[in-house]
Design a protein with these regions (language model features):
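A short glycine-rich, Lys/Arg-flanked "PGG" loop and its adjoining helix->strand segment in the class I
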Residues: 6-23
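Surface-exposed cleft-lining segments at the edges of enzyme active sites
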Residues: 1-5, 81
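Short, ordered coil/turn segments that flank beta-strands lining enzyme active or ligand-binding pockets
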Residues: 20, 75, 124
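C-terminal lobe and adjacent flexible extensions of AdoMet/dcAdoMet transferase-like proteins
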Residues: 88-135
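Short, glycine/charged-enriched secondary-structure capping and boundary segments
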Residues: 5-8, 39-42, 123
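Short glycine-/acidic-enriched loop or helix-start segments at secondary-structure transitions
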Residues: 3, 35-37, 118
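SAM-dependent methyltransferase
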Residues: 25-96
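A short, flexible beta-alpha/helix-coil linker loop
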Residues: 1, 77, 113-114
């Protein structure tokens, strides 16, 4: 979302929907990744004709937000331009947010697209992180 407050509200509402000892499993952008890599180069490397493309990337180290313009083409050939604002989180932030919401067990792993596993330790090479939290 556009603000950290909006993201917190999403986490809070998801938490309210869980039963006691329920698990909340999600992925989020890994804040360690842009400290060691260019987000723009990452998007360019994954660019495939027919898929969305990103341009005008700027990463703000003070807010850990990536601002970019994403262009997509729908099935009818109509081009759309989206002004994006994406938040990256470091593990300590996610842990603190979840502890604030009452989670007792929080695990964070590296997220490999389509092959999520608790065996993957989170590193700066992972674009996303897998979070498993229990109330």
């Amino acid at each position: 979302m556009e603000t950290d407050e909006m993201n917190y509200e999403i986490l809070k509402n998801a938490t309210k929907s869980l039963k006691e000892h329920g698990k909340f499993i999600f992925t989020t952008l890994n804040g360690l990744f842009p400290l060691y890599h260019s987000v723009e180069e990452f998007h360019d490397a994954g660019s495939v004709e027919g898929n969305a493309t990103c341009r005008s990337n700027t990463f703000d180290l003070m807010t850990f937000r990536d601002y970019n313009i994403t262009e997509v083409e729908d099935d009818d050939g109509n081009k759309k331009e989206l002004k994006c604002n994406e938040r990256y989180y470091v593990p300590s932030e996610i842990s603190w947010l979840l502890k604030t919401l009452g989670y007792i067990k929080i695990e964070i792993f590296g997220a490999k697209l389509g092959a999520y596993s608790r065996n993957d330790k989170l590193t700066s090479e992972d674009f996303e992180m897998l979070v498993v939290a229990e109330k």
